[in-house]
A protein has these predicted regions:
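Sequence/structural signature of beta-propeller domains
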Residues: 20-456
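Gram-negative bacterial Sec-dependent N-terminal signal peptides
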Residues: 1-19
Length: 456
């Protein structure tokens, strides 16, 4: 084992990751949480949270061939407990070609995801939709989006986790082959797509499946990131304690997985030390649960931008003060292929395993606070857009506002209305008006002008 380890480390050290690009936050655009999408309504329908409310940016991608952006909604309002036809929004984002200042997005088309038999994919969890926790069926929680060379939509799902290919109009084509070690199973090997630990003993954590998806620049490979470590990996075989998240490589043509790499989250001890005076530190079991990945987008065939964040900030629940919203640049050059390698039993990597190289790219929290913006909890979309007149590149980041909907322990849904000035909140019946002075949580787009030429 010594010689392979030396070789791997030598490769990693011989090919240092490039320095960060120069990121400038240009402006921030908020879209009201009550905004409707472009779904055609039947006669008599007036619209509702789970029918046509804009679900914003669980992921975001840019199509250079058309100049349009695609905004992915997730499983809908209510955390998988109410009916919702899953979808992607084709949008136009006006921008100034010299400065990168963006305006309000305009939805051009709402695209529903349809199965082979014409049935719409649905955000309901498998138990509610299929009456069977072991049957995924048309249950779908879209979280990652990439556009293929032919304009097809590739979507990463959190329930499975799954990756599906659709036509540009949303018609299902195929499912890629997801490695068995990622699939949630009970003791004995029965699939269970609904429950979490301790019922699930192997595979992805509940609500922590695939969270981001990208093609490499050549377009022949796909890379998906899980949000957090697998449920069984880490000390005490508990993923919540681990920093080690899997990046999964797929061959686009065959749909087969070809490799898995380890991405290491920032240590909770580092994040807790940001403000030593606070008492709301991340606990040991929040390391691999409250800190996670939200997006990945390719810079080349081997380098990627990855969005890492905590679960704090403006959202449907009151949280502690946010500490961590960053974009990192990673390289898979020299990283070990851990497909078939267990990371269970320890938070440390096995001897000889080299993680992806990781370097700080931009501190989103600092950039937002420097301009007086409130920090959203769920910054989840990250997309590289067109080149600006001065050679810089327009990069957009977007938020998931959970449709500004929460639910009670009994499974009843409510709209969340917030007064941003004083922080007061109210919960009202779905689709009911917010009290005076309060509004639904908005969707947020952040425009950055990025000088990638500054990278050495």
């Amino acid at each position: 084992m010594i010689r392979p380890l030396v070789i791997a480390l030598s490769l990693a050290l011989a090919m240092p990751i490039a320095q960060a690009a120069d990121w400038t936050l240009v402006n921030v655009v908020e879209t009201p949480g009550s905004t409707a999408d472009a779904l055609p309504l039947r006669k008599g329908d007036t619209g509702s949270a789970n029918l046509n409310r804009f679900g914003f940016y669980s992921d975001l991608t840019f199509d250079p061939k058309t100049g349009d952006w695609f905004a992915l909604a997730d499983r809908g309002p209510g955390g998988g407990l109410i009916d919702y036809a899953t979808r992607v929004e084709r949008i136009h984002v006006p921008y100034h070609t010299a400065t990168g200042v963006i305006g309000q997005p305009v939805i051009k088309k709402t695209i529903l995801f349809k199965a082979e038999d014409g049935v719409l994919f649905n955000g309901l969890n498998p138990l509610l939709l299929n009456a069977d926790k072991s049957l995924l069926g048309a249950s779908f929680d879209p979280e990652g989006l990439a556009i293929g060379n032919g304009g097809h939509l590739f979507v990463a799902d959190e329930y499975g986790p799954s990756i599906y290919e659709f036509t540009s109009s949303g018609q299902f084509i195929r499912a890629l082959s997801v490695p068995q070690n990622l699939k949630p199973v009970q003791a004995g090997g029965t699939a269970n797509y609904v429950d979490g630990r301790p019922t699930i003993v192997n595979g992805r954590q509940d609500n922590r499946g695939f969270e981001g998806l990208t093609f490499n620049r050549s377009g022949d490979k796909l890379y998906a990131v899980l949000q957090d470590p697998l449920v069984n990996e880490g000390s005490s075989n508990e993923g919540r304690r681990s920093r080690n998240v899997r990046v999964v490589e797929f061959d686009a043509a065959s749909g087969q997985s070809s490799a898995q790499f380890v991405y290491q989250l920032e240590s909770r001890s580092v994040l807790n030390a940001i403000d030593p005076s606070t008492t709301d530190d991340f606990s040991a079991t929040q390391q691999g649960r409250s800190i996670g990945l939200s997006a990945i987008t390719a810079l080349s065939d081997t380098e990627f931008l990855v969005l890492e964040r905590d679960n704090r900030g403006l959202g449907v629940d009151v949280t502690a003060v946010p500490l961590h919203k960053r974009v990192y640049r990673i390289s898979i050059v020299g990283a070990s292929n851990v497909q078939g390698v267990s990371l269970a039993g320890s938070n440390s990597l096995p001897m000889g395993v080299v993680p992806v190289q990781k370097a700080d790219e931009v501190d989103l929290l600092a950039a937002l606070k420097a301009q007086g913006h409130e920090v959203p909890e769920k910054i989840e979309g990250l997309a590289i857009g067109p080149q600006l007149a001065d050679g810089r590149t327009l990069v957009l980041l977007g938020t998931d506002n959970d449709f500004s909907v929460t639910q009670s322990g009994a499974g009843e849904q409510f709209d969340v209305c917030v007064n941003r000035a004083d922080g007061t909140r109210a919960q009202v019946a779905l689709n009911a008006p917010c009290p005076a002075g309060k509004a639904l949580i908005p969707g947020v787009l952040m425009s950055f002008a990025v000088d990638f030429s500054a990278v050495n």
